[in-house]
C-alpha cells in the first residue's frame, strides 16, 4: 500500500476516535461496524483476541478477560492510590510486577500478563487499521492526545504505546488543546478570545481555559477530576437498580458479575436515551435466577441520583478561572467536549453558571478531540492548505516543576501553566563547607515543601572542589520539549562538570528492550489474529459449500436430471461433512481445506455430468442452479465462497 497521511487519534479511557485531514477538511473515520468511536476494550478468549466493539459486545460472557480502562493504569505505579482504588471496581486481574501494574488474563488456555502500554497499543493498532481501511493506504504517523492532567510519565508511556503499535507519534497533545484547535478552525477568530473547554468524557473530566488570538492558542489553566465521567453516572444508576431489585425480589445481584454487567449495559443505553427523552425503560430477560427485570427511570430521577456529581463539575470550572486570573464574564466561548456533555442538566448548570451564556455544541462532542488532533497531524506533517497554515499551538505544563533546597523547600524553576517548549536556568550553591557533591531532586507540584509534592527523579553532581559554603556555583537547567518531556541538568561552573537526567518519572518507564520486545509481540499477536481469520474463512467456505451443494441436489427442478444414486452420494457426503463441522469448530485451516477437497471429489464429477446432460448449453440449465452452486469446476479450496465478503452471524 502507498503511504497515507498522518492521522489524529483521541485515545480515550472508554472510547477512542480517529480522524484525518484531507481535501481541506477533517474526516472522522467510522470503524467496520459503522461507529465513529470505538470502545477502548481488548478481550482475550480461548481462540482469539478481540479489540473494540467486538470486545465490548462479549464482555458479559467474558468479564475477567476483557480489559478496559488501561488509560487509568498507564504510566502509574502499582502502589499508586488511584490504581489501588480502581482495582476494586475492575472485573479483571491487576498484578504487581516489580512495582508496575500488569493486566492478567487467560488467553488461548494460558495465563498471560500485559503492561497497560501494550493494551493501549492494541487499541492504537485498531485505530490505525480503521484509518488504513478507509484511506486504502498505510498509516505511519499520528498525533495522539492525553488529558491535560497527565504527568510526564503518563505522557511518555502513551508515546511508548504508540511505538509498540507501529506508529510514529509526531506529538502528544493535550485533549482540550486539540478541541480548541478543532474549534479554532471552525471559527477563525481575529481578536483575542478566551475559551473555556469543558470536557466530560466516559472516564475523565477536564476543564481548560485557552486564549486564541490570530490563530495562536495559549493554554492559561487546566483543572479537573481524573475520575469523573459517564461511567460514574452509569454506576449510580446501576446501584439504584440493584437496590430496586433487592426491594422487589429480596435478592442481591451485586456479586453476580454477569448480571451486573448486563444491567450496566442497559443503564448506559438508558442514560443516552435520557439525553433526548424524559423517560427510559429497561427490560432485561432473566437477569438473575430466572427473574425478568422490567423497570423504567425518569430524567428527573437520573438527575437526582447524580445531583452531587453534576453540581461538582462546576468546582474545576471555578478553579480554572481562578488560575487563569479571569472572571467568568471574561470568557467569550464555552466549548463542550465528551459524550457526557450531552446530558441536559449538565448543560443547564454550566449555562446558568455563566449567566445564561450560549454554549458551543457545533462540534460533535465525541469527535472534537480527534478532529483537532487530525488538524495538528496535518500541520506537523507539513500540510500546505491555507486552512491550517496559520495555526500555532502552545501547550503548558500542568504542574509547577522545581528542585528541593535546604530544609526540604520546593524551589520552583518552571511555574505551572508555563507555555512549553520552555527552558529555565537558576544558579544554586552548597549548603556546607567543603561539600563534595549535591543531590538534585526534581519535584512536580504546588506545595511549599517537597514532601507534599511528587518526586519525579533525582541525580547527583559529584566532584565539586573543596570550598566554603556558598562559594561553588551550580547551574541547574530545566528543559521541556514540545511533547512535555523534560531534561534536567546540573553543571559546576568552576570545573564545567555536568550531570543530567531525562525525567521519565521512574514510574516504571519501559526500557528500550521492553519496547522492542512488545513491538515484536504485537506483530506476533497480529499474525495470530490473521491465522484465526483465515481459519474462520476456510471453515465458512466449507460450510457454505456443503449446505449449498445439499440444497442444489435437493432442488425439485433437478428431479430426473440427477440419478437417485448420485443424489444420495452427495447428500451422504454433505451430511458427513456437516456433522464433522459441528464437532470441529476449532480445527486447523488445512483440515477444512482437506474436507472441502474430499467433498469436491464426490460432487464435481456428478455436477459436471449434469452440465453435459444439459446439452452443454447454459440455456438448458435449470434456473436457480448456478446461484445455488458454490465454486463450480472444483474451485480451489477456499474458493467456495471466501472470495466474496463472508458474513457470519454473531450468536
UniProtKB/Swiss-Prot annotation:
Q: Keywords of this protein's UniProt record, alphabetized? A: ATP-binding, Nucleotide-binding, Stress response
Question: Does ATP-binding show up as a keyword for this record?
Answer: yes
Any one GO molecular-function label of the UniProt entry: ATP binding
Q: Which Pfam families match?
A: HSP70
The Gene Ontology CC terms held by the record are:
cytoplasm; membrane; nucleus
Q: Per the record, which residues fall in region Disordered?
A: 623-651
The keyword ATP-binding belongs to this UniProt entry's keyword annotation: yes
Q: Which CDD domains match?
A: ASKHA_NBD_HSP70_HSPA1
Q: Where is the composition biased (Gly residues)?
A: 623-643
Question: Its GO biological process terms?
Answer: response to arsenite ion; response to cadmium ion; response to copper ion; response to heat
Similarity comment text for this entry: Belongs to the heat shock protein 70 family.
Protein name, entry field: Heat shock cognate 70 kDa protein
